[in-house]
């Protein structure tokens, strides 16, 4: 009897649960703003509208603040920021190409002149994300994808990680 129950349980997991687990992983991956490039970040640059720039670079096993001055960076702070970028998921997103049809533009989302620009390099390639206005509800942000084709609505945890005041 126990052998029969084990076989039934195995069949249930194999035929019912495993496809659902794979489906959930696929959905999670689709909601991520960045792909695998966010796992191998070599440098980060944060610039605001006024031109203030903060740059972090990875040197061997440690991170260094290289602009506006040179200083060893706090490993935990940088780790928190890189983890936020790796796990950043959008609540929703829409194509930039659809904006003209609705009579809107990047400026309506604060992305024509973004409050903040976040640039990172990974494996020698540069990725730039523009961070725009806070949504009407106030707990989310508009960001423009690195390829410039999608606007993502993300949680404000991104702003908190990079030190952006939410009223900016």
Ranges and model annotations:
Residues 1-168:
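Soluble, acidic/polar mature domains that operate outside membranes
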């Amino acid at each position: 009897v126990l052998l029969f129950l084990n076989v039934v349980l195995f069949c249930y997991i194999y035929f019912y649960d495993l496809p659902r687990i794979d489906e959930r992983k696929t959905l999670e991956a689709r909601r991520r703003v960045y792909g695998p490039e966010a796992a191998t970040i070599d440098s980060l640059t944060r610039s605001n509208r006024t031109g203030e720039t903060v740059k972090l670079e990875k040197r061997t096993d440690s991170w260094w603040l290289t602009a506006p001055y040179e200083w060893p960076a706090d490993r935990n702070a940088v780790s928190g920021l890189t983890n936020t970028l790796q796990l950043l998921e959008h609540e929703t997103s829409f194509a930039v190409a659809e904006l003209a049809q609705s009579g809107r533009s990047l400026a309506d989302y604060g992305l024509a002149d973004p409050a903040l620009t976040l640039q990172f390099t990974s494996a020698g390639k540069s990725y730039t994300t523009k961070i725009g206005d806070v949504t009407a509800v106030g707990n989310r942000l508009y960001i423009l994808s690195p390829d410039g084709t999608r606007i993502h609505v993300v949680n404000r945890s991104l702003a908190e990680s990079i030190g952006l005041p939410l009223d900016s």
